[in-house]
A protein has these predicted regions:
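Metal-dependent nuclease catalytic cores in nucleic-acid-processing enzymes
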Residues: 4-7, 105-122
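Secondary-structure transition/capping motifs at alpha-helix termini
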Residues: 79-84, 95, 115-124
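Two-metal-ion RNase H-like nuclease active-site motif
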Residues: 62-69
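Mobile genetic element proteins and their domesticated derivatives, centered on retroelements
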Residues: 2, 21, 44, 68, ...
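A short, polar/acidic, helix/strand-boundary loop motif
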Residues: 80-107, 132-142
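Short secondary-structure junction motifs
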Residues: 60, 73, 122-124
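C-terminal reverse transcriptase regions that engage the nucleic-acid substrate
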Residues: 1-61, 133
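Short beta-strand motif preference
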Residues: 65, 74-77, 87
Length: 144
């Protein structure tokens, strides 16, 4: 998983696809290669050999960040003028599985901003999420 994980930013939904394989690497879990593992392996293999269509970021142009969260993981896409710059995803940590939905959605936003801070620092960007309660946070000038 190490080398495949290195390319995770170029594979959309990497963490969801790789979940059956990463479960095999958990401590105390017997290594049993199931049908889900085979499907996951073949899917990752095909996605890693296909060249992703990514664009280089252009300075001075506005970035757009799309985020989403589920009970499995966090995902995000960085775009500029409708072109994909990068993908990001990760599986939830054990304690994050207990988070309420609005916290998971906010965690996806934080994950995206941390992952792409080198692109976004000092730049204007639009952030899109599918959770309406986060709209309040983004419209406040000051948060306590």
């Amino acid at each position: 998983m190490g080398l495949a994980g290195y390319y995770r930013r170029f594979v959309p939904n990497f963490s969801s696809i790789a979940k059956p394989l990463t479960r095999l690497l958990e401590k105390g879990v017997p290594f049993v290669w199931s049908g889900d593992c085979e499907v996951s392996y073949q899917s990752l293999k095909s996605k890693l050999v296909d060249a992703p269509i990514l664009a280089l970021p252009e300075s001075g142009k506005r970035f757009t960040v799309y985020t989403d969260a589920s009970r499995i993981g966090l995902g995000c896409v960085l775009m500029q003028e409708g072109r994909v710059i990068a993908y990001g995803s990760r599986q939830l940590r054990k304690h994050e599985g207990n988070y309420p939905t609005h916290d998971l959605e906010l965690a996806a936003v934080v994950f995206a901003l941390k992952s792409w801070r080198h692109y976004l620092y000092g730049e204007a960007c639009d952030i899109f999420t599918d959770h309406k309660s986060l709209k309040y946070i983004f419209t406040q000038k000051e948060l306590n």
